Amino acid sequence: MKEVIFTENAPKPIGPYSQAIKAGNFLFIAGQIPIDPKTGEIVKGDIKDQTRQVLENIKAILEAAGYSLNDVIKVTVYLKDMNDFAKMNEVYAEYFGESKPARVAVEVSRLPKDVLIEIEAIAYKE
């Protein structure tokens, strides 16, 4: 059985997709970009500012589904510029302290709305 997850505390999808889908004990979170859900605007600033907003959006979706950051098991990070990797990691480490999920980070030529970062995540909860 699958369940669509939606919360006003994260940005509305910018296309024909769900914020997240819960399937069994898994939660699949769609790629999140640094949109402030209160304003609907892209967060201005550097990679740290944008990474923080993306992770706050993911956290809000997790909480809406009854999960937490500790339940995240896999993350995919899309960066516009791999030179931002170290700065992104500084912020990322604030959110994933002891419970570090498996992760991949790749550089891409372009992201929606020309943002610097997009992150998708998979969570699992017994």
From Swiss-Prot:
Gene Ontology terms for molecular function: deaminase activity
Name of the protein: RutC family protein PH0854
GO terms for cellular component: cytosol
SUPFAM superfamilies named in the record: YjgF-like (SSF55298)
Organism: Pyrococcus horikoshii (strain ATCC 700860 / DSM 12428 / JCM 9974 / NBRC 100139 / OT-3)
PANTHER family noted in UniProt: 2-IMINOBUTANOATE/2-IMINOPROPANOATE DEAMINASE RIDA, 2-IMINOBUTANOATE_2-IMINOPROPANOATE DEAMINASE
Pfam family for this entry, one: Ribonuc_L-PSP
Similarity remark: Belongs to the RutC family.
InterPro entries the UniProt entry points to: RidA, RidA_CS, RutC-like_sf, YjgF/YER057c/UK114
